[in-house]
């Protein structure tokens, strides 16, 4: 390919809409063009990158016996309603684009394909003898992101690889899950990425277990917690840990104390010489579920800990057997709208009376009461007395016996001790999710009644796994991890071109002829090569080459008449003056090929 025919359009200035460096460089390098918020055109340079990533993915999955397919992007609402996900994906903060056809039938524009593939497999696979099977596709997905940002990191239209496996039993699922994890490790290694695999929350996809593959980057949206021995890692949404023992509050006669205007943990401790770990703080949440009901929730946790909203939402879903569409802390405005005026925020205890909800217009009339393990382990504690400016002291759970659920809803944090080894502590880093694998179990096969005949001749539900890779996101994540002040530094395996040849002076015949000879030789040997044949100053060509990040640069310059060229490595920044045989030998060694 010649630059004069590439439609290359580079920018010197940082685009105003780009917040992180990878987004800035993709725009400046002419890799993407923004159409509107969260929607981008993949320009020819990026399309070559995406095709190389896709090729690596397809090659690796084929070695695992996966079959490639292409599923419909338009999906009928009926199958999503049967799985119980239609409301959670289209209401509240749901991310599915939905529409109606001419007949008034509701359709969704596929953000994911669990329902579709489950229905198809149930109509196609009938016996355990046909299992296991693993099917994948690579296609455009659509998600109505509330806040699309960071370019391809969180866009409303993107390219994704999603695979779905079907099994006769759990052991077979776990075997394939392990194989797919290995395949993902191979894929991301071949793409030249530094990554970690961590435990993750399954979110709206669901299932018993899941893991995320994260590219480590300071700009990552996700906080990852990793043990100091690297034997445990998890997204903070999922992470578990052992907290340090707090300061003991010696048991004494339970009593009520006056605490005027001491609404916060800090105020309460500063005025009374308490320690946050001696306090049970209680927060009031409101959970909206897909049964259209709103459930008030009282959550108790040790005063020096924070609530993990993801864990809390999951526990409420399990308790109610409903999907939680939205969960948030109840505000004074919420109370006023419900006609409730006497809940003393800042002084709430775990035993706040359900009678206060009798006045509510649209909420359920009883609190769901949940206590984190950190609070339930306290033998003597301080908590609100449900009256303004009053707290209880030296109370225990025998005196306040109102909790329905005791579980882990605490947010693990850096410095906490590790579950697998108490001598190890959690450390934090930030990451960009590029892959996610799930053990779905029978979640979808049961809801969609997808069955097969097992070895005993009995109808049984499929065991399922699903496995996603964000192809377009991976491309930008690679840039986030591989760049410098001059521009992108693509890993060779996914670079749009492996080599760029620059003619320093297009009017110099020696330089043109030498560059053309090298160009034809590399094409003959199937090297992905770009020839900068523009009538531009050499400095502009060098800046563009650095910006777009081609791994190797050959410059036909002043020494061309002597048959010498400069060979420059974009990553190491090492430049050598070599004859052509030495150039071809060097590149052959780098590309592990016998040609050149």
UniProtKB/Swiss-Prot annotation:
Reaction catalysis annotation: tRNA(Pro) + L-proline + ATP = L-prolyl-tRNA(Pro) + AMP + diphosphate
The protein's name in its UniProt record: Proline--tRNA ligase
Pfam name, any one: HGTP_anticodon
Subunit field text: Homodimer.
InterPro entries: aa-tRNA-synt_IIb, aa-tRNA-synth_II, aa-tRNA-synth_II/BPL/LPL, Anticodon-bd, Anticodon-bd_dom_sf, Pro-tRNA-ligase_IIa, Pro-tRNA-synth_IIa_bac-type, Pro-tRNA-Synthase_IIa_type1
Keywords: Aminoacyl-tRNA synthetase, ATP-binding, Cytoplasm, Ligase, Nucleotide-binding, Protein biosynthesis
Encoding gene per record: proS
UniProt cross-references to NCBIfam families, sorted A to Z: PRK09194.1 (NF006625), proS_fam_II (TIGR00409)
Recorded GO MF terms: aminoacyl-tRNA deacylase activity; ATP binding; proline-tRNA ligase activity
Keyword Aminoacyl-tRNA synthetase: yes
Keyword Transmembrane: no
Matching PROSITE patterns: AA_TRNA_LIGASE_II
Main localization category: cytoplasm
Localization per record: Cytoplasm
Function: Catalyzes the attachment of proline to tRNA(Pro) in a two-step reaction: proline is first activated by ATP to form Pro-AMP and then transferred to the acceptor end of tRNA(Pro). As ProRS can inadvertently accommodate and process non-cognate amino acids such as alanine and cysteine, to avoid such errors it has two additional distinct editing activities against alanine. One activity is designated as 'pretransfer' editing and involves the tRNA(Pro)-independent hydrolysis of activated Ala-AMP.
């Amino acid at each position: 390919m010649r630059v004069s025919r590439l439609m290359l359009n580079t920018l010197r200035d940082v685009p105003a809409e780009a917040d992180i460096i990878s987004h800035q460089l993709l725009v400046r390098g002419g890799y993407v063009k923004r159409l509107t918020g969260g929607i981008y055109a993949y320009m020819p340079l990026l399309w070559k990158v995406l095709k190389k990533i896709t090729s690596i993915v397809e090659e690796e999955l084929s070695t695992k016996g996966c079959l490639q397919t292409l599923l419909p992007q338009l999906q009928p609402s009926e199958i999503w309603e049967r799985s119980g996900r239609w409301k959670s994906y289209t209401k509240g903060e749901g991310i599915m684009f939905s529409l109606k056809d001419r007949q008034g039938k509701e359709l969704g524009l596929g953000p994911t394909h669990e329902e579709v593939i489950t229905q198809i497999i149930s109509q196609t696979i009938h016996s355990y003898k046909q299992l296991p099977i693993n099917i994948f596709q690579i296609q455009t997905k659509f998600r109505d992101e509330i806040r699309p940002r960071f370019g391809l990191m969180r866009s409303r239209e993107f390219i994704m690889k999603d695979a779905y496996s079907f099994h006769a039993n759990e052991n077979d699922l776990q075997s394939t899950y392990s194989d797919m994890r290995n395949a993902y490790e191979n894929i991301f290694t071949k793409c030249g990425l530094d990554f970690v695999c961590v435990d993750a929350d399954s979110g709206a996809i669901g299932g018993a277990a899941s893991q995320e593959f994260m590219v480590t980057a300071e700009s990552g949206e996700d906080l990852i917690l990793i043990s100091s021995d690297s034997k445990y890692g998890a997204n903070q949404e999922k992470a578990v840990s052992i907290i340090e023992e707090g300061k003991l509050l010696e048991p004494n006669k339970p009593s009520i104390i006056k605490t005027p205007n001491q609404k916060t943990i800090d105020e309460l401790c500063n005025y009374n010489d308490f320690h946050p770990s001696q306090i049970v703080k209680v927060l009031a949440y409101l959970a909206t579920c897909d049964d259209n009901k709103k459930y008030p929730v009282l959550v108790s946790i040790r005063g020096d800990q924070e609530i993990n909203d993801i864990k809390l939402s999951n526990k409420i879903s399990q308790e109610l057997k409903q999907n939680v569409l939205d969960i948030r802390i109840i505000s004074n405005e919420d109370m006023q709208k419900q006609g409730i005026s006497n809940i003393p925020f800042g002084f709430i205890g775990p035993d706040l009376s359900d009678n206060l909800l009798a006045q509510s217009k649209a909420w359920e009339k009883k609190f769901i009461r949940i206590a984190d393990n950190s609070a339930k382990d306290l033998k003597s504690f301080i908590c609100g007395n449900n009256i303004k400016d009053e707290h209880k002291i030296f109370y225990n759970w025998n005196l306040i016996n109102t909790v329905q659920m005791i579980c882990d809803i605490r947010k693990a944090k850096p410095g906490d001790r590790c579950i697998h080894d108490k001598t190890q502590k959690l450390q934090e880093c930030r990451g960009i999710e590029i892959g996610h694998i799930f053990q779905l179990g029978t979640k979808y096969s049961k809801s969609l009644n997808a069955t097969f005949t097992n070895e005993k001749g009995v109808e049984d539900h499929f065991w399922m796994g699903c496995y996603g890779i964000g192809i377009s996101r991976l491309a930008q994540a690679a840039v986030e991890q591989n760049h410098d002040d001059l521009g992108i530094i693509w890993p060779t395996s996914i670079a749009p071109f492996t080599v760029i040849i620059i003619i320093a002076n297009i009017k110099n015949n020696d330089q043109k002829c030498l560059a053309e000879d090298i160009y034809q030789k590399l094409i003959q040997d199937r090297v992905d090569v770009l020839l900068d044949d523009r009538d531009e100053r050499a400095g502009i060509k060098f800046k563009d080459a650095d910006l777009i990040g081609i791994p190797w640069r050959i410059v036909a310059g002043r020494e061309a008449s002597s048959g010498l060229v400069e060979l420059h490595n974009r990553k190491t920044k090492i430049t050598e003056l070599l004859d052509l045989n030495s150039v071809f030998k060097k590149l052959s060694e780098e590309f592990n090929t016998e040609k050149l």
